[in-house]
Amino acid sequence: MNFLSVRPSDSDLISSDLYELLESISTKRKMEKHTYLFREGMDAEELYLIQSGLIEIGKLTSDGKDLTLRICQKHDIVGELTLFTEEPRYMLSAKVLEDGEVLVINKNKLEKELIQNGALTFEFMKWMSTHLRKIQSKIRDLLLHGKKGALYSTLIRLSNSYGVERSDGILINIVLTNQDLAKFCAAARESVNRMLGDLRKKGVISIDESGKIILHKRDYLRCEIECENCPLEICNID
């Protein structure tokens, strides 16, 4: 996957004071493609601030399918949902998609620092709440509208995060295989193939010569999933 992001990173959504605190109490660690920073169910002792590379955040569904919830890159933070919880365990898995480096932040050390600064604690908890809303909205689309709803909402989120306006619609400026899209929907690749084929026949999307999707009728997708018009900070692919 080749991600050419235009969305804000987590460092754009938190203050410089909080970001500097995270950097000051961290240590560097290399990460290799196809390894995991953590897996769902493991004891949660660390948070990670990405310096380079790509990380996929997801989980296994009850029927054994991969469900991708986030794709994280430079300056994003992962593992944050375990803060201020007793006997914390990671709720999701973090798979390395591209070699890189992370800053490792000890959970207990961060909690001690935040307790001494109420303003930064409030900011961090507010930021965590935003991430929870993102995950909840993605799961909502899957539960209420099935695989089709998950695919349609994924295309909308991709257009918000990586979209480039054109005269004929919105170019989603990343290259994704149908298998990549299937993981965002916890669906089989064959199902995604059929759904994308239907959208092409209806003129909702097309594929350019480089394999990128052009979204011609985003309002059609919004109508189909009864879009709630969430703000862009919620309706994106991270």
UniProtKB/Swiss-Prot annotation:
* Subcellular location as annotated: Cytoplasm
Q: Which GO terms describe its cellular component?
A: cytosol
Q: What is its main location?
A: cytoplasm
Residue numbers of the DNA-binding region are: 178-197
UniProt entry keywords in alphabetical sequence:
4Fe-4S, Activator, Cytoplasm, DNA-binding, Iron, Iron-sulfur, Metal-binding, Transcription, Transcription regulation
Q: Give the required cofactors.
A: [4Fe-4S] cluster
According to its record, what is known about the domains? The cysteine cluster which is probably involved in the coordination of the [4Fe-4S] cluster is located at the C-terminal part of the protein.
Give the protein name, as stated in the record.
Anaerobic regulatory protein
